[in-house]
Amino acid sequence: LDMQEIKSLTARAAKRWGEKIGLVFDEWNEQLSFQEIEDRSNQIANMLQVLGVRYGDRVAVMLRNQPEFPLTWLALAKLGATIVPINVNYKEYDAQYILHHSEAIVIVTSQEFLSLLQKIRPSLQTLKTILSIDQSDDPNVVDFRAMCETAPTTPTTLPVFPETLVNIQYTSGTTGLPKGCMLSHEYWLTIAKKVVEQHPHLTHSDVLLTAQPFYYMDPQWNLLGAIAVGAKLVVLDRFHPSTFWEKVRQYGVTFFYCLGIMPTLMVKAPRSPLDRENNVRTILCSAIPPHLHRELEERWGAPWYEVFGMTETGGDISVKPHDHDRLLGTGCIGKPDKDRTVRIVDVHNRPVSRGEVGELLLRGLGMMDGYFKDPDATCAAFQGGWFHTGDLVRMDEDGYIYYVGRKKEMIRRSGENISAAEVEEVMKMHPAVQYTACLPVQDELRGEEIKAYVVVKEGQVVPPHELIAYCTEHLAYYKIPRYWEYRSELPRTPSERIAKHVLANEKADLRIGSYDRIDDSWR
């Protein structure tokens, strides 16, 4: 892959695999050939030009996993314009902030979100046009599909460069306002090249599947990986644990990527005699629960490989096939990829010894260009020429890296540093527990105490004393949560991680509504 920008990639796919199906949208019962992907994205690009979109302009997209989302993304890349993906779960405040901060001049959306956008439109000085993929009676809304139908399918001739921005991808974040990661053509093509030339070595015979929203980055690199080799990408509306593997079987999927609590929810779903009746050859996953790793492989018959990456940096560290068997279930995230250099440092940015825990720093090709309109945050993130991930890891004597937890998610109780991830991992091993989240609670005596939010499996009842006894058996005494709260579900980020910042800000006193282990009472 010697492409310098995305439009060369789509043109190449149309020429090589024109009539082959490249995209399947399960929820919308629609499929597109590589030629149709090329033609329709060209139409959108030409239509947006008529509306005044130029090189460097920002265009927001607030859609579910519908064909118009990835097609608009490709169209903007061809124009040298920049997409601003908007989370469909955003309400007025979040949507207004991102549209205002990004200075988007156009937004592509659907009928579902028009009322929200009309409420905030008066405060958006730069927003000129609202395009809806559904027909609207509102004279201030432009019909996306009608305009596309009359637009030519000829490719745009505007020059686009490796450093041209494709996305301003706002991170869901856990603290503060979202930051816009500036992602270039080089960023995206570095990832596409990696999944083709390195493991998992995608080929034209692969069938990829994504169950994540297109406003998150993973479906986007899945799409480019598929276009690069002429593979098919199946797009689900979202992740449904009860039907996920049914869809994998239905479409003959050979590869997928997942992360967060997705593997835990998969393995907790009822078993089926058809579990191993699938074509999956390899699975990439971020944060595979070590205690479930072997069960995941034995149940579905495919290898699961740990990978580490961030919106800011792309793909960085992974377990390679020759290491898979030895590292199975160890929690190891592997070694740096070919285009990455790592450093592990203490709080003073001094390298730590092998085996010691420190913050992971990254350097290499194809990383973000910085945070949009935030030079201070960019300088802080790239201090000393290294990207500071905020993740705590350790490296063993052989150079293998083990994830410990987020720097900001370390709980300090009576002078002891406690990894929230470690406590959560132990609790998830309880047979009745679906998933958990641990947060710090301020305490005058100890500095911080641990609060555990617990979601139990359907039909299960587990009193606090049973979970406390389980933790006592498996954890050091100072790691046992003091406060316990049960929930039917927990809020999630777009990347299927627990949205701990939402939990932390729900109430002024996190002890309220919790069982107190020390006082043996509910607060």
Which residues fall in each region the model found?
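A short helix-loop-beta submotif of the ANL/AMP-binding
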Residues: 58, 64-84, 88-92, 100-106, ...
